[in-house]
Amino acid sequence: MSVRARAVTIALLLGVAGGVPGSLPAQFGYFGQNKIQYQSFAWRVLPGEHVDLYFYPEEEELARVALGYAEESYGVLERRFSHSVQHRIPLIIYASHTDFEQTNVLPYAPPEELLGVTDFLKRRVTLPFTGNYADFRHTLRHELVHVFQLSLATEAYLRYPRTTHAALPLWWTEGLAEYFSAGEDARDEMILRELTVSGRLPTLPQLQYAGGGIIYPIGGSILRYLGTTYGDWRIASLYHDIWKYQSFDDALRELYGRTLAQLSDEWQYWMRRRYFIDVAASKPLALTASLITRLAIKPTAYRLPGDTTTRVLYFSPADGYASIYSRNLEGHDTHIVVHGERTPQFESFHYFESRIGVNPAGIAVFGSRFESRDALMFWNLKADKLVGRYQFPDIVSILSPTWAPDGRSVVFSGLAVSGYSDLYRLWLPEGRLERLTSDRFQDIDPSVSPDGRTVVFASDRTPFGAQGAKNLFLLDLATGTVRYLTYGNWQDETPRWAPSGRIWFTSDRDGSLQIYSVDSAGTGRRETQALGGAFDPQFVDSTAGFVFGGFADLSFNLYHATARSDTGPSVVALDPAPPSATWQWPELTEPAVAQAVPTPYKQHYGLDFAAGEAAVAPGLGSEQGAVLLFSDLLNDHQLVGTVSSFAYSGSGFGNLLDNISGSLFYLNQTHRTNWGIGAYRLRGLFYENDFTSLFQETSYGVLGQLRYPLSRFRRLEAEFRLEHSDRFDFASSVVSEPRRVAWLAANYLTFVKDNSLWLPTGPIDGERYTATAGLVNDVNHGRFDS
């Protein structure tokens, strides 16, 4: 499973290192939030040498890229693990996270921080494309590492069956997937540096049962230390020889000649040597900036008409739900502007990758998930109400909208149904949409110049883009020409224009996230040297300085600081002649990929789960039962069968057959309306009410179920049953007719609402309730029954 920096960010924003809040999946007759199939995908299969890639036509070019990189990754991992996977690997891709949230591979709607998953049952790899080629490659290889891990574990267990096997901790399995895929980025380094310098870096024994997103960078750094110090070959040896050991500690002691505690001490010392040097060159944010608020991200400074007070809009999950807050620079007068994650029109703000725009009239614009795709939302900050909403049929995700100075248009980054990320311009009030860029590159974080003629944005349209680099570019709105503003093998992002014409942005060019500013020629300087990291800047004015996000004390916070004098030294300069050539998706030119012929997806049911039990009570009888679950590869179709029986002692085989119960149920999840049909036979002794009413019943019948989600938080359910019932109540004093033989028709209609917020310990906020109306009719006797 791949979570990476998103989950780490969210977990730390919530102050919870052990997990990310979520919700239970929706089930018939129970609570849980809904996963909605807004569209039916026309799935096709693209075969490779080792991988079968499942895709839909809108993303075919992306599918070929994914297949090429999957086969390349297979070859790399085959050599690193000295192992070949003995089955074809199903790889399912989605063109956006919005589409991914409709997948039936998972029983729940995947949260935004989940970027990929490898399941244990069918060994499927499922992941979305989020617009960035390098991130997609990273996640794909991360998940393929898990495929090899599962294959090696299965091989060891089958060849050398034992009652107990050494269990690998999560930090090892996820850390190895990170180490073998790409390694730590600047945000991972930021968290590792803070843990090390603050003395909070956990030991390896403390990590044995740890979970949550934070284990990804920690585990990756541990495996990097072990690989660079002792050699990667020992990692592969552990998987081949794990069957020999009773515990993970025993395996480490044999392979590395060190105990777990000794390896922990070595790694901790390695980390201190790596990060303590940064203390001398940097200063904590507490010494260089003023804190606005903790547990917050993506600040936007603004002033309402007629008000001289500078306030900041930002995202925060301070109450458990991610909402939009407003606060003044002094850190007082805080209130929630828009409540998020509780209603259909504000389902998600994508707050870890999108920001808010505010114009001089006090109208805030932001992207929000609304039903099947994102919408541009316009919120009047003074009137405190929604004043506009725009959605576009070909755009599924909207990020970082920004106003043009004249207030007549909004520029934003949009992800198309094909998976391509481009810049768009919405003209107001007519709602006309103009596409500003159109290519395979990821174009994000736009900001319009004070004169309204130019857009600065971050993009991977640089020769280093395939490796994850982003540079800043200037787009001339009159001509459509694009030119470099910064250039280099690093990540420059979140640019914003200041009133003076300077551009403030975030960069990791010196190894950590810091704030820089440049003029329109690309010449400028570093503005911060924060120990934890500084990012997402916005220059306000010479009095208020600039606001920005920072990381300190294992928390994402907001700060403001005084800007340096314009006479400071120049430390940033644009290459006098950056290359005009960009880069192309190299996998598309590989013959095996280009010549692969897709075929329509065909349903083939496979056994997912089987379980059985038997019990014998001497002198009383025996009982036995089994359950089987079948599904197709995409889990759109499920088939569940059960069978059980009981026999009284000495009653013989005939009694066993007479007391058989069984059921068969089919569930179709291909459309928004999920439906199921089934048949059953039940026989046995049952209790009801307070367990004082004992009855014996033999029944058989059919049933049908429907589930229609109105939104993520509300749904309708309906059920119809027609059964023949032969029932005898032993508590004859309670009922007037001890025996009832009849055909019964039952109808139920249920409304469910659930926007509750969950932690591993249970719900902590929100509400959930259900209301059911039902009617059971005794067809034979023309009366209602129960």
Name every feature range the model reports, one short phrase each:
Residues 30-37, 42-45, 208-213, 237-355, ...:
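Beta/coil-rich, acidic/histidine-enriched accessory regions frequently appended to metallopeptidases
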Residues 53, 77, 171-187, 194-261:
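Active-site-proximal alpha-helical
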Residues 292-294, 315-325, 340-353, 365-377, ...:
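A flexible loop/linker signature enriched in serine peptidases of the S9 family
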Residues 556-557, 562-676, 740-765:
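Outer-membrane beta-barrel initiation region
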Residues 674-786:
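Transmembrane beta-strand segments of outer-membrane beta-barrel domains in Gram-negative
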